[in-house]
Design a protein with these regions (language model features):
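Active-site PLP attachment segment
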Residues: 63, 69-105
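PLP-dependent aminotransferase class I/II
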Residues: 88-155, 160-163
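Conserved PLP-binding catalytic core of the aspartate aminotransferase-like
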Residues: 142-151, 156-190, 199-209
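Short, ordered loop/turn segments at secondary-structure junctions
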Residues: 54-56, 100, 120, 199-201
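Active-site phosphate-binding strand-loop segment of PLP-dependent enzymes
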Residues: 1-51
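Short, small-residue-enriched loops and turns at beta-alpha junctions
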Residues: 2-4, 24-29, 56-59, 113-114, ...
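Hydrophobic beta-strand scaffold residues
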Residues: 49-50, 162, 194
Length: 210
């Protein structure tokens, strides 16, 4: 809601700092944040921009560099956060990157960074290797996009309602909460892991499996 974002930024003009924080891809519907418009407003009202690329890094964009690649906003985003537990396959852990001045500050002042145990070396090593692989070749990303499109096309042809999205998230809309739980339980019996989501996680009458 860009109008509401602009209203919030206008109301925050008296504050010393302003920061716009958004998901790159919203996990329930798979819809993508309009980063170009968000950055335009942030620059207009002198605000920082922070984007969580957990559901978009490794997936969205021509080479999987996330929504900032999709909307060509590299250099306009100040802070990126992400996870090693999704497209990068490290099972757990996450990262924050961005402008050097901000990262230097976080190393000194971020309590989660200062007072948390570090990740296991094996996870770090595997994750670094994944980043290296993605730099060297687009093959894994391209295959993922191919698989997502195949799944979406076949499910739609079979009569299922799939929310349109530029991401890899394919929410299969069932609308009825009880039905979503029946579907999820039955699929898990077949060894297919899905979760049924219903109100209040999603709006009423918008139950789905994902």
């Amino acid at each position: 809601d860009m109008k509401d974002l602009e209203r919030c930024l206008q109301e925050a003009q008296a504050q010393r700092f302003r920061i716009v924080v958004t998901d790159g891809v919203f996990s329930m519907d798979g819809n993508v944040a309009p980063m170009d418009r968000i950055c335009d407003l942030a620059e207009k009202y002198d605000a920082l921009v922070m984007v969580d690329e957990s559901h978009s890094a490794g997936v969205v964009g021509a080479t999987g560099h996330g929504v900032s690649e999709l909307y060509k906003t590299h250099g306009r985003v100040d802070i990126y956060t992400g996870t090693l537990g999704k497209a990068f396959g490290g099972a757990l852990g996450g990262f924050t990157t961005g402008r050097k001045e901000i990262i230097d500050l976080l190393r000194q002042r971020s309590r989660p960074y200062l007072f948390s145990n570090s990740l296991a070396p094996g996870i770090i090593g595997a994750s670094l290797e994944v980043f290296k692989m993605l730099k060297e070749s687009n093959a894994l990303h391209d295959k993922l996009v191919e698989n997502v499109n195949y799944f979406r096309d076949k499910m739609t042809a079979a009569g299922f309602d799939i929310k349109p999205t530029q991401s890899a998230i394919c929410a299969v809309m069932l609308y009825d909460a009880k039905l979503s739980q029946i579907y999820a339980a039955r699929m898990q019996e077949e060894g297919i892991y899905v979760t049924g989501f219903y109100y209040p996680v999603v709006p009423k009458d918008q139950a789905r499996i994902r």
